């Protein structure tokens, strides 16, 4: 955050999300500062500038590890090293280890894909029809689709759900050892 604060001349917190070994920052404030008239919707331009910005920030952080290691850990040599992994066009953060992001560059390789961690849509215990709907809704949200259009899709799904196959809308779980309960007296009997 100190790099951002020094460059932008403020004391704002620009960190979006932290995890055990990851930090997520928006590079948009830095790109806006360096290119005030830039078209921020131009994916190619933004990816290029974000990768350049990430490299500068990465070098800044890695150099600061020398001071950190000496001052706080009293060691001269260390193995701390940070690197930029992906560029996300948009993201949806719920809580720690639960998010979805639309990645347009992964490790320097151009891509265009949804990356989801911890949300129900990636869990095998989530009903298939709901997984399909919620994946579509997440893609639409990250793709900046109009809210009314998303609402229409949800209402259409709700209407179609009444005639859907139970296998698609029920939880995909089973009951083990069903015979174990065959001779049990029902509760309340």
Q: Where are the model-predicted features located?
A:
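DNA-dependent DNA polymerase catalytic subunits
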Residues: 1-20, 27-189
């Amino acid at each position: 955050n100190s790099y951002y604060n020094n460059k932008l001349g403020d004391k704002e917190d620009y960190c979006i999300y932290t995890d055990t070994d990851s930090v997520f920052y928006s590079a948009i404030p830095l790109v806006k500062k360096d290119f005030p008239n830039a078209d921020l919707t131009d994916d190619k331009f933004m990816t290029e500038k974000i990768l350049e910005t990430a490299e500068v920030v990465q070098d800044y952080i890695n150099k600061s590890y020398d001071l950190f290691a000496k001052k706080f850990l009293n060691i001269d040599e260390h193995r701390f090293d940070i690197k930029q992994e992906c560029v996300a066009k948009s993201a949806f953060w719920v809580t720690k280890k639960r998010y979805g992001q639309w990645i347009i560059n992964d490790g320097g390789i151009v891509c265009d894909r949804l990356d989801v961690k911890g949300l129900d849509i990636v869990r095998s215990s989530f009903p298939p029809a709901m997984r399909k709907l919620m994946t579509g809704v997440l893609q639409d949200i990250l793709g900046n689709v109009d809210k009314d259009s998303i609402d229409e899709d949800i209402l259409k799904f709700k209407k179609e759900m009444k005639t859907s196959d139970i296998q698609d809308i029920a939880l995909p779980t089973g009951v083990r050892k069903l015979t174990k309960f065959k001779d049990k007296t029902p509760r309340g009997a």
